[in-house]
């Protein structure tokens, strides 16, 4: 896109605070964002993740997120059936907007929406790759599938 801007922030690990453009925001320990949650689901076991709530920040607003193991399914990639843990990802807003980190865009606006249904299929053995993901909102479903094993 054509956006360019300046980010001015400082994180202080001694008290877990973030100073952003002069605003002081306390940051809970081990806070997640959408990208660290995706990394977590590809690295940790379904037993560990299932139903556990994680503190989450999304675009300066506090949320909490959890993975719910929905099923174990085969996902076809090329000619191969890959056994996958099928998760639903719940995200709930738990606080007010503290800061606006960047201009809004469609993905970031809607990925944490309470109206979205988020699903992720993770390879059960081996690399624990995310082989399929879908987001449904406002009657539209977007699906991403790994093309080649």
Where are these regions (language model features)?
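Short, surface-exposed linear segments at secondary-structure transitions and domain or protein termini
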Residues: 15-21, 34-39, 75, 129
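Acidic, serine/threonine-rich low-complexity disordered tracts
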Residues: 1-10, 49-149
């Amino acid at each position: 896109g054509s956006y360019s801007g300046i980010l001015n922030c400082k994180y202080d690990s001694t008290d877990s605070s973030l100073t952003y453009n002069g605003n002081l925001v306390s940051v809970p320990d081990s806070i997640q964002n959408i990208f660290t949650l995706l990394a977590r689901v590809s690295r940790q076991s379904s037993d560990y993740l299932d139903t556990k709530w994680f503190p989450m920040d999304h675009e300066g607003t506090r949320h909490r997120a959890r993975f719910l193991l929905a099923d174990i399914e085969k996902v076809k990639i090329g000619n191969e059936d890959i056994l996958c843990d099928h998760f639903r990802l719940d995200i709930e807003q738990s606080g007010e907007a503290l800061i606006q980190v960047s201009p809004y865009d469609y993905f970031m606006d809607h990925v944490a929406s309470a109206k979205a249904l988020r699903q992720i299929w993770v390879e059960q053995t081996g690399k624990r790759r995310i082989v399929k993901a879908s987001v449904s909102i406002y009657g539209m479903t977007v699906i991403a599938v790994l093309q080649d094993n």
